[in-house]
């Protein structure tokens, strides 16, 4: 919801999962480190939504970035995605359903450090 209001592209958990089968995707979890350790989208980075910079992201500004947080009411992912757009990244999406939506869709996860 917040992604759309901020003019960002939104993607569903199933849509992200399909994309991950076909092309390189940088999934970015902006939840707490503890939450990231418990369950995350496979291969997802864990970044502080307010404290990351370009060195934490791929060098290629055309890379596909997908930000997510906990659930549709969370504003951290849209805010972090907007920040990436301001840094010049053009292919930025938000998985608005968050990790909750990913888990509810019974999609594969990773856990641990």
Per-range role (PLM):
Residues 36-42, 57-59, 102:
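Short loop/helix-cap segments at secondary-structure boundaries that form the rim of catalytic
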Residues 10, 27, 44-46, 92-94:
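Conserved beta-strand scaffold positions in the cores of enzyme catalytic domains, especially
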Residues 41-43, 88-89:
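Short helix-loop-beta junction
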Residues 18, 53-62:
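Short amphipathic alpha-helix with an adjacent loop that forms part of the alpha/beta core around
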Residues 1-38, 111-113:
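Flexible, polar/low-complexity N-terminal or interdomain linker segments that lie immediately upstream
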Residues 45-46, 63, 109-113:
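Short, hinge-like loop/turn segments at secondary-structure boundaries
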Residues 59-103:
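Catalytic cysteine-centered active loop of the rhodanese-like fold, especially the PTP/DSP P-loop
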Residues 47-53:
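Glycine-rich, highly charged phosphate/nucleotide-binding loops
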């Amino acid at each position: 919801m917040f992604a759309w209001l901020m003019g960002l592209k939104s993607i569903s958990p199933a849509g992200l999962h399909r994309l991950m089968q076909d092309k390189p995707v940088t999934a970015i979890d902006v939840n707490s480190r503890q939450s990231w350790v418990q369950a995350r989208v496979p291969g997802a980075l864990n970044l502080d939504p307010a404290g990351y910079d370009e060195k934490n992201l791929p060098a290629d500004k055309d890379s596909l970035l997908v930000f997510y947080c906990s659930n549709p009411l969370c504003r951290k992912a849209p805010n972090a995605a907007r920040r990436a757009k301001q840094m010049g990244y053009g292919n930025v999406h938000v998985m608005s359903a968050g990790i909750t939506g990913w888990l509810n869709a019974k999609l594969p996860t990773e856990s641990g450090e």
